[in-house]
Amino acid sequence: MDSTTKLAIGAIGIVFGDIGTSPLYAFRETFVGPNPLPIDYNHVLGVVSLIFWSMTLIVAIQYVTILMRADNKGQGGSLALVALISRSVRNTNYGWLVVLLGVFATSLFYGDSMITPAISVLSAVEGLVVVDPELQGFVIPIALVLLVGLFVLQKRGTAKVGALFAPVMIVYFTVIATLGLISIVQHPEILYALNPYYAVLFFINDGFLAFLALGSVVLAVTGSEALYSDMGHFGRGPMKLSWFGFVMPCLLLNYFGQGAMIVSLSGPEAQEAIQAPFFLLAPEMLRLPLVILATFATFIASQAVISGAFSITHQAIQLGFVPRLSVRHTSDAHSGQIYIPVINWALMVAVILLVLTFQNSSNLASAYGIAVTGAVTIDTLLMAVLLVGVWKWKWYYAAPVVIVFLIIDGAYFAANLTKVPDGGWFPLVVGLIVFTLLTTWARGRKLMRERMSEVALPIEIFAKSAHNSATRVPGTAIFMASSTAGVPSALLHNIKHNKVLHERVVILTVEISDIPYVDPAKRCEYSEIGQGIYRAILHYGFMEETNVPEGLKSMQQCGGEFDMMQTSFFLSRQTLLPSDKPGMPIWREKIFAWMLRNAATAMEFFGLPTNRVVELGSQVRI
């Protein structure tokens, strides 16, 4: 088995869980949701046709074929796309708008990562009611136990159970495809839905009701943005192979199978079957095993979304949109497997509240969709900038492509906006809160750097004056600096209060690049300023762990050498003071100050040895 096939199999277990569990509720919701459709031949074929063409246009063409070509050194996702585009449009008038769009798409993802575990696990456990209606009262308790267990297990990492993900998902996809195929063979007339005529006829006959149905049909493509975000783990080739060669055919067979079953029924029988078409495809004796298999699949889908939240948060920290948080690496073999406690517990609380508030997957479906369609629409806008600004397409080639996708994505987003009163407000509120936090932190850090640079002493002047103004003591002192310009405040405070300078003083800056990984040969820079004072820079990509002691080992190739037992680290801890200077509104200053107080220490974030760290306070007015 070649490496591409192995990676494709691995991707089936990790990447496609979200979109793979959509058949549990997507088709059903068009007929039982807030705007239910009448159950008849034309409506069933219209919905199945819409699902087929939505999956083809949005997932297969927009994401897998076009956007997956837009990788930032192998990484995908909104933030990676923004970093890629920013290098080409940084000095243009719309560069700031590109960044804001990418940050808002990322903010919407957090709302999605709260809803996905709740709706996925609930929809699977609700299958118990199909097996035995008397189990209705156990659905929410079982779902809550499973979800709490999922979040509690996060700190142990997924390395041990991750090997089971691909086999379970392969069995799951094979089973749902087989059940769908059996139903299609029994009622092959459902295959007429391959013809877009039935989707068009649906809109001609039903107009606004068909438009509202888009809000439920879009549930079939939830998880498409996650495919792009997870591209860095497996690569474009293996993911295209697994999507076109296995996942997409399996999903379509199941959707067409559900449609075939409903088409064959009428009246009360159809009304009863539409409540759980996914589970009713299976013979009665196999429904309980299908419930168990679907529960495992939703567990894996939820795991993928939670891991995605950790990964995106880590990227946002490195790119300067989120304060330093405690990031724990759960695998020595895979640097991408991380655990962020504060994100984990915040997601768990939100998911529990969602389950208790909405009570069932059908109610939750109303909240689902806005975050996904919002992110997809933003990705389409970013794609327009990518085609013209980065790939240098002529506008008359790019315009038709972008317009087609904007019409499709915009229609889905508009249809989902009608669900705001029924629960769609939730991901929007989460997105706005997260967007406010991310932009407040980025703006506050920018203002802090500007204020500190205004009063910073040039390093050359400091080196000349320090030679005669302080007693030199043995050893090496490393002063962490956020900028390569000027003297760090911790160094000035050390001179002011302690009146000493170490024999070797190193001003160290950690710089995060807008690429995921930095070539180890370009990791460090090391130069002498004079009077025993040196400038050192460590370069990292936004996907890498910023472990300074490990990074200092690479300094040997740049001319520096460090003995940790003879080295002390000096850090500055800033305190904000109110200021009359124009910067941010007071309410945002208070939010920024709160985020600054609760951020992880530089000692923890950079992996510094606790017994070798000295922290000095400083005050900043923004």
From Swiss-Prot:
InterPro entries cross-referenced by the UniProt entry: K+_transporter, K_trans_C, K_trans_N, Kup
Keyword line: Cell inner membrane, Cell membrane, Ion transport, Membrane, Potassium, Potassium transport, Symport, Transmembrane, Transmembrane helix, Transport
Reaction(s) catalysed (UniProt annotation): K(+)(in) + H(+)(in) = K(+)(out) + H(+)(out)
GO cellular component terms listed in the entry, alphabetical order: plasma membrane
Keyword Transmembrane helix: yes
Transmembrane segments: 7-27, 44-64, 95-115, 133-153, 165-185, 199-219, 243-263, 290-310, 338-358, 370-390, 395-415, 422-442
Membrane topology, record value: Multi-pass membrane protein
Domain of life (superkingdom): Bacteria
Any matching Pfam family: K_trans_C
GO function term, MF aspect, one: potassium ion transmembrane transporter activity
Compartment list: Cell inner membrane
Residues making up the signal peptide according to the UniProt record: none
Chief location bin: membrane
Function: Transport of potassium into the cell. Likely operates as a K(+):H(+) symporter.
UniProt record similarity statement: Belongs to the HAK/KUP transporter (TC 2.A.72) family.
Protein name: Probable potassium transport system protein Kup
Gene: kup
